[in-house]
Amino acid sequence: MQIIELNELQFMNYSNIHSKKNYKQSIEYANLEEKNGYNKLFLGLIDDNQNVIGATLLLEKKLSGKYKYGFCPNGFLIDFFNSSLINIFTVELKKYLKQYNFIYIKLNPQIEYQIFSSSFILVENNSNVINELKKLGYQFINNTSKYHIVLNSSDINKTYSNFKRSLRRNIKNSLEQGVTVHR
């Protein structure tokens, strides 16, 4: 297995089928950040059959001299619960980036650290993922927000009708201006 640079089509095909896909790991977000002075790199871990099994958008910023740092917004598109896969991805990524003078990368993976029920009973504890990342050399910086509210809705039209009128108008205007919404 090795890390290679993916073209936009390869990255888009992989990211569209991945369960952790998000707007910050997209070509559109990369193009937006390119206007803010970042260089975009689409990197993927391929197996022996040339199948992509992990990928990331890496935003590159030059530091002084020949050195660079990278930022992977919302983490990698990989199964963080598969410790051997994340280990291989990290080792190969370090090798790949070292040859291009990267001194560090920053990422903020979208991992639910702890999930509580509505009555604040711990339902799921994923601290083992954080511990595994620490073993691989990642430094954990505590998240500043305490809770993220997730609204589970089966009917998108009902949810939309419950929005304030001004929010519905803003959504309508955005769609008319070409903003696309992905689920």
Model feature map: region roles:
Residues 1-9, 129-183:
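Acyltransferase donor/substrate-recognition loop-hinge adjacent to the catalytic core
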Residues 32-114, 118:
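Conserved donor-binding loop and adjoining core beta-sheet/short helix segment
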Residues 85-86, 122, 163:
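Charged, low-complexity surface patches
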